[in-house]
Amino acid sequence: TIETSKDNAEGANACAAWRFADGTTTVNLRYGISFISEEQAEKNLHRELKDYNIKALAEAGRQIWNETLGRIQVEGGTEDDKTVFYSSFYRTFERPICMSEDGRYFSAFDGKVHEDNGTPFYTDDWIWDTYRAAHPLRTLIDQQKEEDIIASYLRMAEQMGNMWMPTFPEVTGDTRRMNSNHAVATVADALAKGLKVDTAKAYEACRKGIEEKTLAPWSGAPAGWLDNFYRENGYIPALRVDEPENDPNVHPFEKRQPVAVTLGTSYDQWCLSRIAQALNKKEEAEYYLKCSYNYRNLYNKETAFFHPKDKEGQWIEPFDYRFPGGMGAREYYGENNGWVYRWDVPHLSLIHISEPTRPY
């Protein structure tokens, strides 16, 4: 039923409908969006879409994208190669998104509207997916934006009240998707390249995110049994077939992902050691550097794969590195199998732990 007497709608499933005269072929429609208020949405509309000149708007957008993508000039290769490169480069700007609106922003991390004090607030950064390449690229082509993104992480940590670095910040808050705490890698990389970071605050947030929050994938719960086991033994234990789960922090579908979490956390702790070193925290830097070698605890020299162990320290056998652990190999890895996770450790380190007689 369409209620023609109303000119507004509210609610999660709110919608609007329009009727047009017969023969109408073109409709001009503008709309404003705001996470703050209706008044702010109207201001955003008039600032961003002053009129219905679609051609002028498209040309302005084209110029912005040409300037943005023109930061990298490609020589050589074919036109197809350039198309692939610039299409991929374009997608690195998909996220994170800037939430600031005229100097204010809504944060789902505490449900409040804040002043940004001149520093844009970014979110919707799927860090598990972006820390390896997108963030390092940004440190080379847009250092100011990378600094603002990391500053946004620290605001999130403060706003959540626990000072835990976010792991998967979205518009709706930190959804804690995937595994590990790879925001620490963005901080370590930024410091290594001379970017401006509140190092002390970043270290606190990264350390607490790793130590106080559970390492169980897809969870924002406090550290529990699995975390204590990892600290004492240097790896996340795997369950044997039909062995019941005993840690309530473990997601029933996402499972423990023990190899993925062990390898990912080892890298996170190496990054944390670099930040501690930058702060001249020598003992903590040495401690986390030692922890960073935990990936070796799951390296099976006989097979040259990273292999899950049970809580007694025994390899899970028999084992198929191609199709292990159910949907997405989550019972042992995380959305990849043993062959892919073989390369999760930097290659020079793999060479060091491989048998010298085995070809690399």
PLM regions with names:
Residues G70-V74, S88-E94, T139-D142, L154-E158, ...:
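Sec-exported extracytoplasmic/periplasmic mature domains
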Residues T1-F121, R155, A200-L215:
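Acidic/polar, glycine-enriched structural segments that form the non-catalytic walls/loops
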Residues L154, A285, K290-F323, R358:
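Non-catalytic carbohydrate-binding regions of carbohydrate-active enzymes
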Residues H352-Y360:
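Single conserved hydrophobic/aromatic residue that forms the stacking wall/gate
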Residues T123-A276, L289, Y341-S349:
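Aromatic-rich carbohydrate-recognition surfaces in CAZymes
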Residues E94-S100, E158-W164, T214-P217, R296-F306:
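Secretory-pathway/luminal and periplasmic proteins that interact with or process carbohydrate-rich
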